[in-house]
Curated annotation (Swiss-Prot):
Belongs to the SIS family. GmhA subfamily. Its cofactor is Zn(2+). GO terms for molecular function: carbohydrate derivative binding; D-sedoheptulose 7-phosphate isomerase activity; zinc ion binding. It comes from Cytophaga hutchinsonii (strain ATCC 33406 / DSM 1761 / CIP 103989 / NBRC 15051 / NCIMB 9469 / D465). The lineage of its organism: Bacteria, Pseudomonadati, Bacteroidota, Cytophagia, Cytophagales. It holds the Pfam family SIS_2. Binds 1 zinc ion per subunit. This is Phosphoheptose isomerase. HAMAP family: GmhA.
Length: 191
């Protein structure tokens, strides 16, 4: 019983990744996203990332791999995850959770920066508000989504969508591979 569960889970994860790879061969969205991000960084911009739950962890992981290190030693790359508990609780209490990311961008987002918006459904209200604010500020938007891309799909400059309609964990597993690939491409472009 345990062995069959383990094998079925790994096979399902492999199938979701394989399906995404076939789509990516046609769309080339990861390369487009890396190009948008590196162009911004080369012009003095920064990357601000956001998401909810596991996607928040992915947003933090992305930022720390850039400000810290991924595989090799290199200069720090400007990236911030919107995850400060004081900011989040203040804005959620005073304005509503819908605005926790957009208020941060209102304060710290600049024209030419990049917002990495992560939502497995593509419909997270606070992420959509962040995208609206990013667009108002003249920022570029790269989105990581799942399912059909949701409302986020048409709003992003580049949307990397994992077309899986099952549980979000499978989408998140592919998102972390995408994040690591983006970081590798960013490093290769900047070094």
């Amino acid at each position: 019983m345990i062995e069959s569960t383990i094998i079925s889970q790994l096979e399902e994860a492999s199938a979701v990744l394989s399906n995404f790879i076939e789509q990516e061969k046609k769309q080339n969205s990861i390369a487009k996203a890396a190009d948008v991000i590196t162009s911004s960084l080369k012009q003095g911009g920064k990357i601000i990332s956001c998401g909810n739950g596991g996607s928040s962890c992915d947003a933090m992981h992305f930022a720390e791999e850039l400000t810290g290190r991924y595989r090799e030693n290199r200069k720090a790359i400007p990236a911030i995850s919107i995850s400060d508990p004081s900011h989040m609780s203040c804005v959620a209490n005073d304005y509503g959770y819908k605005f926790v990311f957009s208020r941060y961008l209102e304060a710290l987002g600049n024209k030419g920066d990049v917002l990495l918006a992560i939502s497995t459904s593509g419909n997270s209200e606070n992420v959509l508000e962040a995208v609206k604010e990013a667009k108002n500020k003249g920022m570029f938007v790269v989105a990581l989504t799942g399912k059909d891309g949701g409302k986020l799909l048409p709003l992003a400059d580049v949307c990397i969508n994992v077309p899986h309609v099952g549980y979000a964990d499978r989408i998140q597993e592919v998102h972390i591979k995408i994040i690591h690939t983006l970081i590798l491409l960013i490093e290769q472009s900047l070094l």
